[in-house]
Amino acid sequence: MGALAAGSLAAPASAADRMVALDAMSLANYHQVMTKVLARSDRIAVPSFRFGLVMRNGVGASGGSGTTSADLKADLVGVDAAMMRQLAHLAFADFIERLRATGRTVLGWNEISASEGFKKLDPTPAPFLKKPFADSRTVAVVSPEYLPLLTIGPEAPLSDRSPFNLGNARALNAMSAALKCLVMIPSLVLDFATLTGSGHRVYGGGANVGIQPGLFLVPLFTHCNWFHAKIALAGEGGRLILEDRVAVGQAGQLVQTGSFSNNAEIEEWNAYVRSNMWWTEPNMAAPSRPTLGYNYSTYQYRVDPGLLQNAVIDAARATHGLYMGVINANRPA
């Protein structure tokens, strides 16, 4: 006869303490691939801009070969597709403004949309929702209202097609070859909270999960792709890929919307065990011994639209500023 462990919510250490601050983000936080391609042309076309938000996340933990479990789910609320497209527009406008400030020639939409390659593009319906394989997050991705949402192989796992599908890649190559330009597609994705868990243990008794609210740039999902080609069938490309989580700030309030556990039942049993009444008063009716310990909770991160817009603009400015530094460092001879 022994005490039981209960599933519990454990407040994690401040998420910002384990992230890079937005004003401290640098190229050291990015993986750079084939930046020399940026020097192939002074002309740049930006046919799409991808903006995403994590809409749902969850974490689970267990201990004692499954006898104790904890589960937490969280949703982002107060955001719709129209708001996301407006945020995508603001981020895209910042990118184009900074790109023009580098002195590069930024092609207009009429020229881009009239190109042969553009006509061959297969856009992804927006908003695009994706729960990547072996990932608890569900991400919504959009483009500005007036731009197509384009997906290519390097966008995996936020993709609606196989990495071996070369249709859009060849269309972008055709666009680059026809317009004699670089083609760039940035992607900016933010999450709303950091979730932690004690994992799934065979011998450990307890199971803990926790949540820390706060927007941050998502590694891997946040990046910038570029392409250059002389013919449609073959080209070259490069990328800047965020490798670290970058804290952006708060844009709303975290609210617990549900909780379900048998912690009180477990504590009653543990108090009975610790009291030794089972030995000193063997004829006393004992409380029922729980066979499992569980703790389930749900949360909502309720967005303030104004705060979210400010946070997205701040994240876009910081991210795009680094991109422009790489573009300026790789100019045509």
Language-model features and meaning:
Residues 1-15:
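N-terminal export signals
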Residues 15-333:
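A structural "domain/chain start" motif
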